[in-house]
Amino acid sequence: MRGKKPLSENEVKSLRKLLEDKPLHSLLLNIGVDTMLRGSDLLNLKVSDVVTESGKVKTEVRVKMMKTKKNTLLIPLSPNSIKVIKKHIVGNNPDDFVFRSSFSPFTKKPLSIFQYSRIVKKWMTMLGKENVSEYSTHSIRKTKSSVIYQKTQNVEIVSKVTLSF
């Protein structure tokens, strides 16, 4: 297999359980899998991208892709993502990053790609993976389309889901 491996549906379920009490990790996993965004786009999400001014969790995220400069995309969020956003993000400052780095609490910078990559590798260790180098932030991006393909064996459906990416 070329590139980084995606996670299986069972691996995602296991991680959701393992990460329940880790807000940042739970948010990264759920929103990362749902949105299929590149790490750079995912980490730049702000609270206002996922929560309305009145404090309600949005059911869709509006994102302009940084790398490709593509038009703004409207990406639906799953009940899992909505649940973790309600639990950990509602009430935060709308200008804060969803994935704020703990290394720079005063500058309020987002998590770096390097930090995100280390977190993904830590997850793989938690799952008992021996070769964590087969996984990266791109693994999270590829997971949803891989799960859809495994369930349907239909490339057209996967293409429709990932067409805008």
What are the language-model segments listed below?
Residues 1-165:
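Conserved catalytic core of the tyrosine transesterase superfamily
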